[in-house]
Amino acid sequence: MSTQTTKSNSRSLIIVDDKIPYIKGALEPFAEVLYLPGEELTAAIVRDADALITRTRTICSAELLEGSAVKFIASATIGFDHIDAAYCRRQGIAWANAPGCNAGSVNQYLASALLTYARKKRIKLRDLTIGIVGVGNVGRKAADLCHAIGMRVLLDDPPRQRAEGRGNFTSLARIREQADIITFHVPVQCAGEFATHHMVDNGFFKDLKKCPLLVNTCRGEVFDSGAVKNALDSGSISGLIIDCWENEPEIDLEMLEKTDLGTAHIAGYSRDGKAVGTMMSIRAVSRFFKLGI
């Protein structure tokens, strides 16, 4: 691709994923702006860019950024798995995502999914205990929703508990013992004290005391797909609602067939969520470059 990205004056050059909605015209008074398909960005194209505004389609790693002028990356998404944070830190490249931008949309999806499941099973949600794993932007809204329904709510968030004290938090072990429904709202952390990659594995199911419904609207890699399928086959769990899958877009079709509700990572896909993500990205770029937007 021979797109010209060389700056013609002293203004910053910002390359923007052309699928990000509601952004055209917002930055042009303050910077040179180039709109391109995010999946087509290459090292040659971004070489002279000062900033990127991306979605998850653009893998921001050494392969793309090495030798470039990029100083800042804004992702108009909650997720930031596509940004190599360690590489950016070493190279002095700042970045920002858009946490909570679509939390309301995910919460609406969760409400619809739970009500659909309850009607299908002819059960009353207010008679059940729900465990919420991850009590951030989405998890907090989920807790408010479930309290409003009349459910008993158990909250597990080790990082928040470490920072804030025990408060209303409990342990994942207690959730595994008492919850009729367990819903996950955590980022993917592959290592460290608070690792979440494959936190739902064979060991997770061995400690269950009930036969809960599992819900995943966060990240596919939080679930070990093989372990989840085994749990469904053995009756260790009563059902599965899943919006986020391992190895997207090459999802496990066998697991899809076993779900009570399976969707294509659309829980947070809404106009208002996209608009807020765009706004947060513009503000992040403005703060970094002192544009005054």
Segments the model singles out, each with a brief description of its role:
Residues 1-49, 154:
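N-terminal glycine-/charge-rich "phosphate-binding" loop or analogous flexible N-terminal tail
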Residues 10-11, 126-129, 202, 211:
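Phosphate-coordination loops involved in phosphoryl transfer and adenosine-cofactor binding
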Residues 21, 148-165:
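NAD(P)-binding Rossmann-fold cofactor-contacting core
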Residues 50-122:
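Phosphate/diphosphate ligand-binding glycine-rich loop within oxidoreductases
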Residues 59-61, 160-253:
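Rossmann-like adenosine-cofactor binding region
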Residues 97-101, 105, 190, 248-293:
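C-terminal helix-to-coil terminal segments
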Residues 99, 107, 126-147:
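Glycine-rich adenosine-cofactor-binding loop
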Residues 107-123, 148-151, 279-287, 292:
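Oxidoreductase and adenylate-handling cofactor-binding alpha/beta cores
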